[in-house]
Amino acid sequence: NLTWRTAASYMWQQVREDYWDNGSTRQADANQSPYGYGYRNNDEKYSWQVTNTLNYAFSLDDHAHDFNVLLGQETWYTESMNLDNEYHKFTDGNFGLNDVSMGEPYTWKSGKSREGLVSVFGRLSYNYKERYLFTGTLRADGSSKFAKGNQWGIFPSASAAWRISEEAFLEDVDFLDNLKLRIGYGTAGNNNIDNNMYATSYGSGHYGINGSDYITYVPGTTLGNSNLKWEKTTTTNVGLDVSVLGSRVNLSVDFYNNESSNLLIKNKIPTSTGYSDQYQNIGAIRNRGVELVLNTTNVRTKDFTWNTDFNIAFNRSKVLELYGNEETNYFIQDYESRMGYKIEVGKPLGQFYGLVYDGIYTTDDFTQLSDGTYKLKDGVPSLKGFDRSHVKPGDAKYVPQTGEVDENGNPVWSTNDRTVIGNAAPKFTGGMNNTFRYKGFDLSVFMNFSFGNDVFNMSTQRFIGPYLSNQNSLAIMNNRFTLIDPSTGKETMDLVRLAELNPGQYGNDIMWNISENNKTAISDHSSYYIEDGSYLRFSTITLGYTFPKNWIQNLKLSNARVYCTLNNIATITGYSGYDPEVSAESGALTPGIDNSSYPRSKSWVIGVNLTF
């Protein structure tokens, strides 16, 4: 009844990268290298893990009371080293990096990072006649990501279940096969932050004197915080399992409440500190919801069966607290300065925060002047601080929210007019799988879905306009407002002529013109880039055939099956990007980002299962 088990693993990898630009490239020219520029990087990493568990099981009173005790220990360690060297000003480019003495060192960088995690844990399980079940666990984790005094976290949990259908008062209920009530409470820790964030690090930088480069120490962008500690999530769960009609209908319902405190967040700090951000334990959030799983046998005959598996989940998040922010009850988390997220006490996570896009200025927003020019009509909003005489038809326009006006009483908008413009959290998600079997044939069709979630289409924002060097534009810019009269090849100021050139200016799909006025439109935090990400995906279809036993018995086979599987067959969605099921490069505070996410591939698999 006593079992001791040990598991161990080791990983080592090395990556070497050599890069060379001869003197004819722009990169070499930018690095003052008429005969070439290059760098050589060497990265090495190894990690190991050892887990030991001791398990003891015993019973009392002829298995009426079953006990199981487990004790365990786990150690994980990783270390990485890197050496990066850049060379420029080569006097001869024929040898490349084979002779770096031909050039001058530009940057020499090296680094070493270590990370370790030590865990001890225990579990006690008790089972009384498969009717009453109890489990308690205790886990302690020590992480090198925190400073001494904060490295260890203690995380207990417990669960209980009551199989009500085993009670005497239900033994005469023939249609009921299983009725089980479950309840659980537990805690878990999270240390998912960059390494060494409890200390302030420094890097190397350049400064020039008399045409020569000198290397010096410079502070990093992140200020260390020795007070960092484990993020903690407390989970409460109540569930019910029901099986009826000879287990042809099985239902599981779970209600859960997860509260996370001491959230580890990289927070913006005043630039007067000399740094831009710092990891802090600054908040608490709650996720609450219900999950439902339904399994049914819809048809069951001698030759044909049809089973359905269906699941659906409803989750609602809420920000409970924000520490260290007494002035306001919210803060704005920017993602690469391209979209804002409003994290606000009492509100859900995933709130996109930006300006409300109001289409473009049409010719109706202007008055033709006697000198052939035009001006913006009074009462038409414009950007605060921007000369209204420079506004043109086809410029992007936004909705003022604050009621602010300029000195002439005209409404204006600014960054103060940003508001909540969407939410990345779906109202519900789920999936359904139908399996059909007829004699030796089987067919399985799986679909999954999400409804009510918004997506920040960063791909559109990046490539919508030709404002960056060597950048093409998306095809939607073919339907842009034009200021150029093709008969003259010049910009026209005639409003009547502009209306003739842009008959679709009142449509929802008209794009702004590509004048300098709209250069900021590719970086504005705007509702234009927020789209409905709801979808229904036909994810997998599998068709198989199992050969009759009498066909294969002479081949010394006990079972033989051939099958074909199609993956990612089709997706029904209104999203304009490749895939609405995205969250590229995003975290809990910045979800729902499509940053040129690689599209899911369609694939097929043909296989054979043989059992000897």
What are these regions (language model features)?
Residues 84-86, 91, 280, 297-422, ...:
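Conserved small-residue
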Residues 430:
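Extra-cytoplasmic beta-strand recognition segments
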Residues 438-458:
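Glycine-rich phosphate/pyrophosphate-binding loops
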